[in-house]
Amino acid sequence: MQHKKVQMNLYLAFRLLIGTFFLSHGLQKLFGFFGGVDGNGGAVNLFSMFGLAGLIEFIGGLFIFLGLFTSIVAFIASLEMLTAYFMFHVPTGGILPLMQQFNGEPPILFFAAFLVLIAFGAGKWGLERKLLGREIWHQKR
């Protein structure tokens, strides 16, 4: 029983960290936080591909952090990460992240994290479970 409690606590920390980091990328793109996209606080045009990415990252990161529709949001976010990787990172140096000019590791690592979130959902401490009594796509554990 103690082992399962440790697993649940570690998974909660994992979900909160992924949500926070993904949200921070959305804040950077949409509102120019953390130096913005240009290093000087610049934000992207909301009605552009980067604006759509910022919305997915901002809303998706918030929902993942809160544990709200986690699997669905993680699925959408995983598609964004694959798109970012193949459209913007691979053309700068090949399929391997270390060969790329613009560091392709973050989208691949986010993609892997989202696969875990798709598989396991929000977990015990997700807001979705509190509001709906269960998680969509997952049975109560």
Locations of the language-model features?
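Extended, low-polarity transmembrane helix blocks
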Residues: M1-F31, F47-L55, I59, L66-R141
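Membrane-interface helix-loop junction between the first two transmembrane segments
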Residues: K29-G39
